Amino acid sequence: MTPTVLLLILCFGVASGAQAHDPKLDAEWKDWKTKYAKSYSPKEEALRRAVWEENMRMIKLHNKENSLGKNNFTMKMNKFGDQTSEEFRKSIDNIPIPAAMTDPHAQNHVSIGLPDYKDWREEGYVTPVRNQGKCGSCWAFAAAGAIEGQMFWKTGNLTPLSVQNLLDCSKTVGNKGCQSGTAHQAFEYVLKNKGLEAEATYPYEGKDGPCRYRSENASANITDYVNLPPNELYLWVAVASIGPVSAAIDASHDSFRFYNGGIYYEPNCSSYFVNHAVLVVGYGSEGDVKDGNNYWLIKNSWGEEWGMNGYMQIAKDHNNHCGIASLASYPNIF
């Protein structure tokens, strides 16, 4: 295909999108742009409006099916509304799973004695939801959240820890700042560094910067860390008895980015390819646990406007759904 033909097709697509705009959505589109401070050139606005309307139609269709009992969760428009599916997927990078954590033959049996419900928020282990912005720092938020919980267990004080400290300084152990990283490498950094600053002394900037760690400002430290086998049983034991656990999931689907509430189950989710780090802060079930409507409660880093005030219920005991147990780890503080 020649560049000229490609340009004509792109221009035709924009023009067609402009003609197809639904005037009934004018007010919603204007309100959405205001809410998220969106500003476009005339040509760009035509394209983004078309994408936004397509996403709006998808959300409304999904929610209609939810009202008919065809799925267990709802969706809503949010800050990702003007992105295509491909653009959204490109904004989250695949997280490599070390070979030591990909053994599919871990023993799976019914564990006796574990509670059917846990929510570490109710026991004071979890700091408020934050927003990573355009930086790919999910791994740092997940790591900081797990350390925050263990520091609360040890000291009785809940202190937001510095995500920026992890972004800027853990490149020495393999993380890549806003580009990508893993929580267990962040734990490795804190272990070797013998300290991590608080958010108050090393605030979040949402971009890469030079390492500015000051040992006199250290607010947390860890003794070691544990990488869990990729099996939901091990994750269950850890979340039930240890505290919030860092994990990673396949978050590349439209259903995830527009999630609103309910137990998330995405048939196309991968159990082996993960691209977004989260913090598992509990688990439970809707109705009787024997009915199989079990969920993990995860804390995201996309702000309180996303999901259930920044949280999601994701299907539990569904063959490692979305890879929830594929890259789980937690720090120890003795």
UniProtKB/Swiss-Prot annotation:
It is found in: Lysosome. Keywords: Disulfide bond, Glycoprotein, Hydrolase, Lysosome, Protease, Signal, Thiol protease, Zymogen. Its EC number is 3.4.22.-. InterPro entries: Papain-like_cys_pep_sf, Pept_asp_AS, Pept_cys_AS, Pept_his_AS, Peptidase_C1A, Peptidase_C1A_C, Peptidase_C1A_papain-like, Prot_inhib_I29. Expressed specifically in placenta. Disulfide bonds join C135-C178, C169-C211, C269-C322. The keyword Disulfide bond applies. Residues 18-113 form a propeptide. This is Cathepsin J. It comes from Mus musculus. The gene is Ctsj.
